C-alpha cells in the first residue's frame, strides 16, 4: 500500500481526502478503517467518543440524528452507519473490489454482515468481551450470568457463519477478500480475547482457520486498538 492506513501524513491534506469520525477503539469504526486500508485510501480520523462521560462535542455534525459513530464525510457527502460507509468506500475509491460481482455472492456477503450486526455483535462484544476483559477496569466483577446467557446466542450466530464460510477459503466468501471479512474481523478482534469467545471460534474449524489468517493481515495489525493489548 502506498498510502497510510491511519490519518493523513503532513502535507497530504486534501479537500478530496475523506474524514472518518469516531473512536479508534470502536468495532464499527474499525470496520471502516479496515475497508479504507484495504483500498489504500488516505484519510483523516477525527476522534469522537460518544460513549465518553462528557459525550460527543456539541458541534458534532451527526449528533442530532442518532448520536452514532462512525460517521464519514467525502466531497460534501455525509454518511453514517458502518455498513453503508464501507459499501461507499468500496464503490467510490480505486483499489481492490471488496464485493463480489455475482448477485448470489453479493447477497451472501450482505447476509454475513447482517448476521454479525443483528445476532453476533452485542452478545460477543458487550456481554463477553466487556464483562470478561473490561469489567475489572471499571472496578467491578464480571457479570457471570450475563456471560452465560450470551454463550448460546453467540454459538448460534457462529454456527450460521461457519456454514456460510467457504470451505476452501482463504476468505469467508472464497478467494476474494470482501466486506464480510472486514466486519467480522473487527468484531472478533475483541470477542476472541475473552476465553469463552476464543473457545467458541476454535470449535468451528472453518471460522478458526479463517481467523488465524485474517488477524495477520497488515490492515488488522495497523488498526489494532489499545484494548487488544
Task: Name every feature range the model reports, one short phrase each.
Residues 1-144, 148, 167:
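GST-like domain detector, emphasizing the conserved glutathione-binding G-site
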Residues 45, 223-224:
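A generic structural-conservation signal
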Residues 103-104, 176-177, 225:
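Short capping/connector residues at structural and topological boundaries
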Residues 118-213:
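GST-like fold's C-terminal all-alpha helical module
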Residues 220:
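C-terminal active-site "lid" helix and adjoining low-complexity regulatory extension at the edge
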Residues 228-229:
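Carbohydrate-binding/catalytic loop surfaces
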Amino acid at each position: 500500500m502506498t498510502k497510510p492506513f491511519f490519518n493523513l501524513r503532513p502535507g497530504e491534506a486534501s479537500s478530496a481526502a475523506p474524514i472518518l469520525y469516531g473512536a479508534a477503539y470502536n468495532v464499527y469504526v474499525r470496520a471502516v478503517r479496515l475497508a479504507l486500508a484495504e483500498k489504500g485510501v488516505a484519510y483523516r480520523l477525527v476522534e469522537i467518543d460518544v460513549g465518553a462521560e462528557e459525550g460527543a462535542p456539541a458541534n458534532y455534525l451527526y449528533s442530532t440524528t442518532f448520536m452514532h459513530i462512525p460517521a464519514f464525510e467525502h466531497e460534501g457527502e455525509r454518511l453514517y452507519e458502518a455498513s453503508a460507509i464501507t459499501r461507499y468506500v468500496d464503490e467510490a475509491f480505486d483499489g481492490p473490489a471488496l464485493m463480489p460481482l455475482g448477485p448470489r455472492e453479493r447477497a451472501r456477503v450482505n447476509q454475513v454482515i447482517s448476521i454479525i450486526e443483528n445476532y453476533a455483535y452485542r452478545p460477543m462484544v458487550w456481554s463477553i468481551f466487556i464483562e470478561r476483559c473490561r469489567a475489572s477496569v471499571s472496578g467491578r466483577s464480571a457479570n457471570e450470568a450475563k456471560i452465560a446467557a450470551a454463550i448460546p446466542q453467540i454459538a448460534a450466530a457462529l454456527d450460521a457463519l461457519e456454514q456460510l464460510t467457504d470451505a476452501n477459503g482463504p476468505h469467508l466468501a472464497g478467494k476474494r477478500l470482501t466486506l464480510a471479512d472486514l466486519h467480522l474481523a473487527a468484531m472478533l478482534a475483541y470477542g476472541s480475547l475473552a476465553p469463552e469467545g476464543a473457545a467458541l471460534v476454535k470449535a468451528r474449524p472453518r471460522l478458526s482457520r479463517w481467523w488465524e489468517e485474517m488477524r495477520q493481515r497488515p490492515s488488522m495489525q495497523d488498526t489494532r486498538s489499545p484494548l487488544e493489548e
